[in-house]
Amino acid sequence: MDIYTCLQNDHNEIKDLLDELIKLDERDSYRSVLVEQIKSGLIPHARAEESVFYNAIRAVNSDKSDVMHSYKEHMEAETLLRTLQLKDSTDMDWKETAIKLREALTHHIAEEEGKIFAEARNILSQEEANMMGDAFEKLKAKVGQEGFLKTSFDMVVNLMPPRFIDKMRNLQAPQ
């Protein structure tokens, strides 16, 4: 499966989970389960996408502004997700935050599947897109097991200039 299909599948799954969450009654106990499923889908997706897809585009494309904008949108979505987790646990305006997260992700996905995918298709061969899809799925599974602290460090590393990424990753490797 190519990287575009992998990303689109995840996008659809996360949007569906958010839609289901937003439709819930205020007192539905299933809400916390859905919030956890959204987190478990969104965080690994974002880290793997940044590492595999965004960093590949940054490495070969001289105009990095669209990809850097996408990183910013990931940070905004994760801030909303953490706010949603807090509001869910305290029963405070969680639905309003879920709607904001859904809107932010809908905007991000539209830009990514439009502008970013178009850029990538001009850069990547189909074989490379297939290889990136495999790498994305493997990394996503690994990230899903590592927790928030490790993935927060990965977000910072992914924002480094491409030539420094490996050096930064070596800083966190066990000695």
Language model: regions and residue ranges:
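Small-residue-biased structural context
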Residues: M1-Q175
